[in-house]
Amino acid sequence: MGKTQKKNSKGRLDRYYYLAKEKGYRARSSFKIIQINEKFGHFLEKSKVVIDLCAAPGSWCQVASKLCPVNSLIIGVDIVPMKPMPNVITFQSDITTEDCRSRLRGYMKTWKADTVLHDGAPNVGLGWAQDAFTQSHLTLQALKLAVENLVVNGTFVTKIFRSKDYNKLIWVFQQLFEKVEATKPPASRNVSAEIFVVCKGFKAPKKLDPRLLDPKEVFEELPDGPQNMEAKIYNPEKKVRKRQGYEEGDHLLYHECSVLDFVKSEDPITVLGEMNKFTVEQDDPEWKILKRLKQTTNEFMACIEDLKVLGKKDFKMLLKWRKASRDILGLDKDEDKGDIEIEPLNEEEQIEKELRDLQEKQKQKQKREKRRKNEEKQKELTRMQMNMLTPTDIGIEAANIGRDSLFNLKTAEKTGILDKLAKGKKRVIFTEDEIAQDNDLHIDENIVIRDRHDMNEVDDLEGELNAMYQDYKNRKAERDANFRAKQARGGDVEDEWTGFEGTKDSEDENNEPKDYIESDDSELSDEDDDEAINQLISKLKSQNNGSKLSSQAKALFSNPLFENVQPILQSKTDDVVDSESVGDATKISNKRSYNEMKKEDLSDSSDEDSSSESDFEIVANDESDGDIDSDYDSDEERKRTTKEKYDKDIDIATVEAMTLAHQLALGQRSKHDLVDEGFNRYAFRDTENLPEWFLEEEKQHSKVNRPITKEAVMALKEKMKALNARPIKKVAEARARKKMRAVKRLEKIKKKAGLINDDSDKSEKDKAEEIAKLMRKVTKKQKTKPKVTLVVAHGKNKGLSGRPKGIKGKYKMVDGVLKNEQRALKRIAKKHHKKKK
């Protein structure tokens, strides 16, 4: 017979066994506590007092003496004797006895343990159920000893075995510790049923319920509750087979009963779940009555033959049939109850009843308020977690205005809802004669007055369309990079800007709406409300009399910085703006404003009609004044500066612009022709008060289609080709850095060559050789490794010994899988910028 191979004590002689021998530990279990300590925050390094229960042979004590601080107290106890260890106190005792407790107190005196370790297991071999209970009982005794000696926020590490008492022990741990985690370190064998539980943050309760540490209470087996038959009826397809044997006194799997018993039973769900079949007694008079029911169909008779194959729909049909049967048989009729006489309450009882009702209502109100606040806090937490940091105080304050106090205009202004109130409906309506009498206006009777409500609806609709279009643009900009680039190049088309402030007369004629409705807040007598009303009226007037600016321009110039700025002159042109006229207008306005400033500064001047020349004769010019006039001493210099400025900004980027440039350069067109082309059907297009989405859509159709030439297209292509041929910024920077390094190396060599040349002790031949040696270092090319050719070993190369045909240089025989792996490794190394060794 052949010799059998030794199994190494069922696999116990693994790598941790040999590592323990190399490190000098007494058992391989030392690596378990090392791995647990590293995983859970190095608690041994912070422990000055450590108790090791069931410590034999002492490997955990060895690890503790190595990792704990110097002069730490380490105590090891076991029922079997142990060899002594340095810096460790060991004694022999049973941890379940009082002798062990007294000896521990004698060694520790007034100290408390920072960490308690337990890696014990009882003697097994009686029976599986007995062994599992004994192991859990030993763990509970170790916990009892740890609770007596642990410090607050201490740590308890114990070994526990998988059994039906595992969850009970975990529940006990959770009552005594802040954090309980189960782990299985790599040093623990997979075939072993052991699990290590790390309990951190000992609560150290002042009064401890003795039932938590009583094995009879902790491991008590509770009777099973009633079987859930509803799951069988309403989810018959989800059947979980539990192989737990027969019930007490019931040794059959097949059960049947009469269908009348099912009708008369108080718990029909249980009957449907337990029975396999309903039998029918044809001679029973009650069945003869139920047989004539319209629900008693052939399908019903087929269903009661085998209840275990029915589905949810069939069970519902049986329950409906039972309800109809009970109605016919009169089983659901309520028994006649006698009239209950209610004694009238006296005055004291009535008062007490009302007080109880009021208290109950108050409690309900407080409960609702508390629930509302909790919901708001929860929403706020969720909003903060999702990084939705938009302030919501305005909405909350506005929601609480009508709840806690009366309406107040001052409060409305503080909360920021004054604008919304200004746009709301008014109640007091005045006639046209009253408005004309107050404002000294003449109103034509033939004017058709539109309904204010309809106008508000139209305004709201336009606002919604504009908001939706803006959202559409934002979403498109997020998705499409070309659209973002187009917006950045062209920008948004703004309305025409006529200055910082418009003339009052034109504003009154053009922008003042005919409002025939006024507010009913005139009866308010409070000073704060009067002040707020005046502010509201002035704000509305400023909004109605605003200049023709876009929303962005209004937001910019509403800054207090622009309050004292005077309006400038600006001529309205459509396509072509004459730079000379703009420059003249700017020059005139600057000089005029400067003269006015000089007039205000002259306090001793009595003649108000004096010209600007007299002002200059009276007041001496400063250096800054001379700078103002010297900026535009020469019109030619100003024109040249303006031309240079605009020449820098011009970029011919379209075919139309290139065609126009060619025509201007060849003399085919003149400046006068360009001015004439500026007057076309689209030049005076009325875009005022039109929505942005409409203008964007019409923009592509509201322009002149200019002809292009083949030469312009080719010239633009050559220009773009030259631009595309340029390297990217990173490549250009890399080349520049490389060139700079080469220049620096050359400068160093020049300095060294100069030093060598100045050395008088060397001959000219030696100098030339050393300089040539330096130059060779600079011009030396880096050696490149020869490329290895990969040859796939299949077909004619399969099993080939020697060099394959047609392969020169170094080669490597690989199969298909290895080739793919090598390529993948190269891709990974290239991706992470690592050199493969």
From Swiss-Prot:
Residues 518-529, 603-635 have a biased composition (Acidic residues). It holds the Pfam family FtsJ. The active site is at 159 (proton acceptor). Residues 359-381, 483-529, 573-644, 779-808 are annotated as: Disordered. GO terms for molecular function: rRNA (guanosine-2'-O-)-methyltransferase activity; rRNA (uridine-2'-O-)-methyltransferase activity. Keywords: Coiled coil, Methyltransferase, Nucleus, Ribosome biogenesis, rRNA processing, S-adenosyl-L-methionine, Transferase. S-adenosyl-L-methionine binds at residues 58, 60, 78, 94, 119. Residues 345-390 form a coiled coil. GO terms for cellular component: nucleolus; preribosome, large subunit precursor. Its EC number is 2.1.1.-. It is found in: Nucleus, Nucleolus. Residues 372-381, 593-602 have a biased composition (Basic and acidic residues). It catalyses: a ribonucleotide in rRNA + S-adenosyl-L-methionine = a 2'-O-methylribonucleotide in rRNA + S-adenosyl-L-homocysteine + H(+). One of its GO terms (biological process) is maturation of LSU-rRNA from tricistronic rRNA transcript (SSU-rRNA, 5.8S rRNA, LSU-rRNA). InterPro entries: RNA_methyltr_RlmE, RNA_MeTrfase_FtsJ_dom, rRNA-MeTfrase_E, rRNA_MeTfrase_SPB1-like_C, rRNA_MeTfrase_Spb1_DUF3381, SAM-dependent_MTases_sf, SPB1-like. Belongs to the class I-like SAM-binding methyltransferase superfamily. RNA methyltransferase RlmE family. SPB1 subfamily. Component of the nucleolar and nucleoplasmic pre-60S ribosomal particle. Required for proper assembly of pre-ribosomal particles during the biogenesis of the 60S ribosomal subunit. This is AdoMet-dependent rRNA methyltransferase SPB1.
